[in-house]
UniProtKB/Swiss-Prot annotation:
Cofactor comment text: Binds 1 zinc ion per subunit.
Biological process terms in GO annotation: fatty acid biosynthetic process; malonyl-CoA biosynthetic process
Protein task: Component of the acetyl coenzyme A carboxylase (ACC) complex. Biotin carboxylase (BC) catalyzes the carboxylation of biotin on its carrier protein (BCCP) and then the CO(2) group is transferred by the transcarboxylase to acetyl-CoA to form malonyl-CoA.
EC numbers for this chain: 2.1.3.15
GO cellular component, one term: acetyl-CoA carboxylase complex
Main location: cytoplasm
PROSITE patterns given in the database record: COA_CT_NTER
Official protein name in the record: Acetyl-coenzyme A carboxylase carboxyl transferase subunit beta
InterPro entries registered for this protein in UniProt: AcCoA_carboxyl_beta, Acetyl_CoA_COase_Trfase_b_su, ClpP/crotonase-like_dom_sf, COA_CT_N, Znf-ACC
Organism: Chlorobium chlorochromatii (strain CaD3)
Cofactors: Zn(2+)
Amino acid sequence: MSWFNRVKPSISSTAKRDVPEGLWWKCEECGAALHKKQMEASDHTCPQCGYHFRISPYKYFSLLFDNQKYVEFDDHLRAADPLHFVDTKKYPDRVSDTIEKSGKTEACRNAHGLCGGETLVISAMDFSFIGGSMGSVVGEKISRAVDKAIELQSPLLVISQSGGARMMEGAFSLMQMAKTAAKLSLLSEHRLPYISLMTDPTMGGITASFAMLGDINISEPKALIGFAGPRVIRDTIKRDLPEGFQRAEFLLEHGFIDRIIPRRELKSDLTTLLSLMKL
């Protein structure tokens, strides 16, 4: 009965390779699988459908500043907890956890350098840090970016990428809307241009304050731009919304923004704008 006890050889299988995390991306628009090198070559846009992935302030700095050289400033500012706010966790703990996980210190970064040979100050927001929400630090950083632009006698570019005001700071957060709007008026007094670039998403108190106050308001393709979200509006008015409502293309058609610029054309178009504004 030796044949009965004979063990059949198992099917051989190839050992699985460990794929490094972040090597492959999936396009949220068309589902295409994109290699990291493809993403970097296309400035984190989908080569198939043109979808724009969210990128960090550092990537915008590298994209826009000549030779990727720039000077960051006011990185030492940190959020306080004046309301001792607690939801599922204490606000300071939430900020600390976000800093630890992301390696970022706030939802906004400031830098200055040369863009097309012209001095430019950039204040860029980061959705990955608590939804890019605007608290007292973000408001202060944008205000200081205005001061730096006046000091250098240069234009200011603010790149918005935010869900709105930071609820954990309550009225202190809402105060930043008035603060940033008032501060931007100083640029007009000094005859310095302010360019607002809205990326996906630009919502809530950001749209209601500095994002729509640019001398020139531009946007990346298909960016969600508005105050309340489409679902909230639909549920409130009990009506279906037009197709593409609150997308950049809809806003351009209705005169709310001046131009839509694909990310790969942003540096060249911005250089042209800066040279024209200098005349």
